[in-house]
Amino acid sequence: MTDWVQLLIATATALLGALGLAYWAYRAQSDRSALVGLYLLFGIPAVLLLLAGTAVLVRGDRVLGPMLLLIGLGLGLPLLRPFREALARVTPLDPDSAIDMTGLSIVLGLLGLFVGNSLAPMADDPPELIPSVGIVELLVQAAFLVAIAYIAVGLPYWRDLRAATERLGIVAPDPRTIGIAIAATFACFVVAAIAGLVSQQFDPGLSESLDEVVDQITAQVQNPIGAVVLGASAGIGEEAIFRGALQPRYGIIIPSLLFMMLHGPQYGFNLALLGLLAVSI
């Protein structure tokens, strides 16, 4: 019961925080004081992290120091207009948008965190102990990611439900879309197979280790219903946030990198993630 309460409290807190930040960014589009507040919200932690990371790195910590620096850079770089303008040349990002700036700070900050984690000793090895997930946890995770995706594209502030759904690209598939999806599925299997062969050549024991990790994660859902829920929850939730919300604004590379690094703590920061990146792209 305690785990359920903690899960619900954490989920509700994150959603309320996302709603508050989305409204703040929306107000910052036309309210200069709100925009200044956003710069302070991300800029102060960024500066402190950069200073702390530099100090820790000078003292010889080659793991925590770079991690703090990367997170600080991720939070702080989007606040610099030249950085946003440079990124806007290769992505659909609007350099004048406070909303885009806010989202980019969060995305790059998270990316810095996960890249920093990959620098830890033995980070490339799959973890030995991974808690398994149940059907309810998967459903809550999917609902949470979908809710975050809707909030990220403006619900309920600058888009209504219909407009937000259209912005996320959630529509009934037509025959052409179904055909593309089937072809893409086969292509993903090919890419995954190639990645498996490459990892087998360079790290022969990796495949067996990953199989053990997957077995641990899916221990509670190794049944027909669990398999359907596992596939649907991951597909719906992750596609909504990465493909629906992030990719149309930040291009395909940044969301794909975040998607790849997000799975590092589960599978280890190793060659398997390169295959995941290729599949994601």
Say what each PLM segment does:
Residues 6-13, 59-74, 130-148, 184-185:
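Alpha-helical transmembrane segments
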Residues 1-37, 50-58, 185-281:
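Transmembrane helix-loop-helix hairpins at the membrane interface
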Residues 2-5, 89-107, 111-144, 153-233:
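Juxtamembrane helix-loop-helix connectors linking adjacent transmembrane helices
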Residues 17-27, 67-89, 148-161:
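Membrane-water interface of transmembrane alpha-helices
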Residues 40-57, 109-117:
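A generic, lipid-embedded transmembrane alpha helix
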Residues 32-42, 98-103:
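Membrane-interfacial loop-to-transmembrane alpha-helix junctions, especially the N-terminal start
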Residues 72-83, 106-120, 188, 257-263:
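C-terminal halves and exits of single transmembrane alpha-helices
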Residues 57-58, 84-93, 271-273:
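A cytosolic-side transmembrane-helix exit/cap motif
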